[in-house]
Amino acid sequence: MAHLLILDALNLIRRIHSVQSKQHPDDVAAQLAATDITMQRAVNTILQEATPSHVIAVFDSEAPGWRKAKYAAYKEGRTAMPDALRQGLGQLQDSLLRLGIDSLVSETDEADDLIATLVKPLVANDHQVTLISTDKGFCQLLDSGLQIRDYFNKRWLDHAFVQQQYGLQPSQLVDFWALTGISGMNIKGVPGIGEKTAQQLLSEYGTLTQLLDADATDNKKLQLVQQHREVCLLAQELVRLKDDIPLGFNLKDLRYTPPA
């Protein structure tokens, strides 16, 4: 059985760079150098803990993807990557390569969809897949068998985490976010439906489809959801990860060979 380790690269790098930019506020070159060194240390620790047979780092594209084409306000207002870091990504990718880790960089697809595409066939064939990320959006993939490790908080984002955080099953998370929206992505949910109400509705009805089809007589919250059907369905589409992107390589290309 193979064990693929996936690094959500910018999720890791941007958090490291944020710390280093505070420690070297007036020196962008020092920020990048410190980010590079700290990233390498972090990745070495991750490799030692995970002991993978295969590994890849996945980077986001800067180009607008299908979500932006579908919904023009997608991720509006999000803090842009600092220019110095953007210009230094090639250096960081070279450092990863020296550690034995290739980088997947798409011109058109978001890292989240690329990761979901990597995960799907491997877990279906009983291979182990561990993702290093703090992004809770990946928890929608937990039922597939994916393991998610939050490196910074030293915790697993697993079924128990989802139950504690949301009171739901991983399979219900897409519908949960379709109701509440996701502010960090500027995805709108149903006005007046917060996390507690969304959890209650999904605990009772199971899925967004059942919520939209249910008899809403004498249930104002349900009426509210049904009045915002199109908002919910758009958010559901935007939140759900695509897992069918042609990648052009296979598992054997990702075999991890530690540097000599």
From Swiss-Prot:
The biological process GO terms on file are: DNA replication, Okazaki fragment processing
- Molecular function (Gene Ontology), one example: 5'-3' exonuclease activity
Q: Which organism is it from?
A: Tolumonas auensis (strain DSM 9187 / NBRC 110442 / TA 4)
**Region named Interaction with DNA:** 192-197
Q: What UniProt keywords are attached to this protein's entry?
A: DNA-binding, Endonuclease, Hydrolase, Magnesium, Metal-binding, Nuclease, Potassium
Q: What does this protein do?
A: Has flap endonuclease activity. During DNA replication, flap endonucleases cleave the 5'-overhanging flap structure that is generated by displacement synthesis when DNA polymerase encounters the 5'-end of a downstream Okazaki fragment.
Q: Which PANTHER family match?
A: 5'-3' EXONUCLEASE FAMILY PROTEIN (PTHR42646:SF2), FLAP ENDONUCLEASE XNI (PTHR42646)
| InterPro entries, A to Z | 5-3_exonucl_a-hlix_arch_N, 5-3_exonuclease, 5-3_exonuclease_C_sf, DNA_polI_H3TH, FEN, HhH2, PIN-like_dom_sf, Xni
Q: Per the annotation, how and in what number is the cofactor bound?
A: Binds 2 Mg(2+) per subunit. Only one magnesium ion has a direct interaction with the protein, the other interactions are indirect.
Question: Domain 5'-3' exonuclease: where?
Answer: 168-258
Which residues are K(+)-binding? Answer: L179, V190, I193
Q: Does the keyword Acetylation apply?
A: no
Residues that, per the record, bind Mg(2+): D112
Cofactor(s) needed: Mg(2+); K(+)
What EC identifiers does the entry list?
3.1.-.-
The name under which this protein is listed is Flap endonuclease Xni
The record's family statement is: Belongs to the Xni family.
Residue pairs linked by disulfide bridges in the UniProt entry? none
Q: Highest taxon of the source? A: Bacteria
CDD domains from the UniProt entry: H3TH_53EXO, PIN_53EXO
